[in-house]
Amino acid sequence: MAHILGIDLGTTNSCMAVIEGGQPVVIPNAEGFRTTPSVVAFTKTGERLVGHAAKRQAITNPERTIISIKRDMGTNRRIKIDDKEYSPEEISAMILMKLKADAEAYLGEKITQAVITVPAYFTDSQRQATKNAGRIAGLEVLRIINEPTAAALAYGLDKEGHQKIMVYDLGGGTFDVSILEIGEGVIEVLATSGNNRLGGDDFDQRIIDYIADEFMKEHGIDLRKDKVALQRLKDAAERAKIELSSALQTTINLPFITADANGPKHIDMVLTRAKFEELIKDLVEKTREPVETALSDAKLTPEQIDKVILVGGSTRIPYVQEFVKKLTGKEPFKGINPDECVAIGAAIQAGVLGGQVKDILLLDVTPLSLGIETLGGVFTKIIERNTTIPTRKSQIFTTAADGQTQVEIHVLQGERPLAKDNKTLGRFILDGIPPAPRGVPQIEVTFDIDANGIVHVSAKDLGTGREQKITITSQTHLSEEEIQRAIKEAEMYAEQDRKRKELIETRNKADSIIYQTEKLLRDLGDKMTATEKEQIEAKLKALKDVMNGEDKERIERAIDELTKSFYDVSTRLYQQGYTQAGPQGGTNPGGQGGTDGNVNTDYKVY
């Protein structure tokens, strides 16, 4: 059976895993790393880079490098590169395509299905955007699950007995907290809360601002206005943050960060852990309220929590760990990898859906209340937050005016009492209502939330049976036509990437035979006939002339011609008692010696 890929699509880094032999296994990317930077870049020559390659060139190409795109999922932001605009879904799809391709190379099979995680506090529009990104990347997204829930799956897979756990998930761009009950193969989410714009990126920004402000005081230059300098600051801030998790101080050294009339300027400063903690104190404090809300919604006290699990790279910060310990009165559990456990949980859920993992039932919840706008601009809730999903609930409404023949259903998500203060998910019209005095028609509004947390709404006039149904899509979403266009472009990009990789491999092969041929000419050129030497040099020049071109077939023909001449000459020299290693990647024309087995030589053909 084909593998279903479990994907943690993170703000800063992404990770993937599958079930192998009944157990979750993290898949390394093509570069050999277990996590992949969620970074996309476009070079000035039009090449697209994803992951480590994109991150490495960010300093020299900041304007064409896209980071933390997850924060823009579900919005109408567009990223303009040259004369083309990209949606957040399309950029996220590029990251997913990289993960998909690397997983296929690792597993040796085609991947078509995935389970993707999202922050528990993601809205419906953000979940829809994530699902669309999967489609564009060529993945059927079987399930969208919440990150803290995935972490709990990773933790609870082999646990016996009943436990109430808190998952404190502080990643690169989002914060979630979930309270769950685990026992007898059932993982039930009791409550969830969070902040979709709080994470390690914000910690980095505090360091950036601190360095820039100190530099401004000393030199009167604001480095934040210089895009290349700012990117260097971002890299330095991230490194400093990571180093301060294990060291009490770190040195930030950025030579030639800028220059003025007096010459080049450098940064060489020490950042202590104490100063870093002072810079981020108020940001960490912002996690207190969601934790208290989740506990309150779950009707539990900190004392009733058996285990606190830390998830997300930002929980490696000692100050965060100490804050959680003081807040909950519990020493946080550090027995799972905070960078990988969400992907592992996604793989377990994929295993459940694929039938590879048995006896696990996951009961998740909707993070925010859902309802509609009613008379006076009031938000009337139909499904309360922390309701177990999938779920379906209905409520009867009526008209607000005499003779009203249609009603607009304004669908909202949030917790504020007034409609204008909540997130609009969509609007639709139910018409054809027979004229009647206000308050007489009965209109049944039904909310249906599927296991992905995606909302479907219907409105039905009980008098006529007339009904309207929609799956919520807000104006920030890509239309079906736009999604199909993006899918075609993604397939085109994948084909371009494949051809590019083949071209690079062919050039590498050419480079190898050029090196071997030049070595042969240096070492044994005086043993060749004039004709042999002339032929090899001509074919060597022909290969050098074409190897940096874009025509792969032409390069391959030149390789074949040079290889043939190389072997013709080297075989003759070998038979005369000379030795020379053949070019890598060529076809072995001979063996290890003569047929009598008495020739003993170091001649090799790779």
UniProtKB/Swiss-Prot annotation:
SUPFAM superfamilies referenced in this protein's UniProt entry, alphabetically: Actin-like ATPase domain, Heat shock protein 70kD (HSP70), C-terminal subdomain, Heat shock protein 70kD (HSP70), peptide-binding domain
Transmembrane segments: none
Composition skew (Gly residues), residue ranges: 583-596
InterPro entries recorded: ATPase_NBD, Chaperone_DnaK, Heat_shock_70_CS, HSP70_C_sf, HSP70_peptide-bd_sf, Hsp_70_fam
Modified residues (Phosphothreonine): 174
Keywords: ATP-binding, Chaperone, Nucleotide-binding, Phosphoprotein, Stress response
Gene induction: By stress conditions e.g. heat shock.
GO molecular function, one term: unfolded protein binding
Annotated region (Disordered), positions in chain: 578-606
Superkingdom of origin organism: Bacteria
Role summary: Acts as a chaperone.
Family label: Belongs to the heat shock protein 70 family.
Protein name in UniProt: Chaperone protein DnaK
Source organism phylogeny: Bacteria, Bacillati, Bacillota, Bacillota incertae sedis, Caldicellulosiruptorales
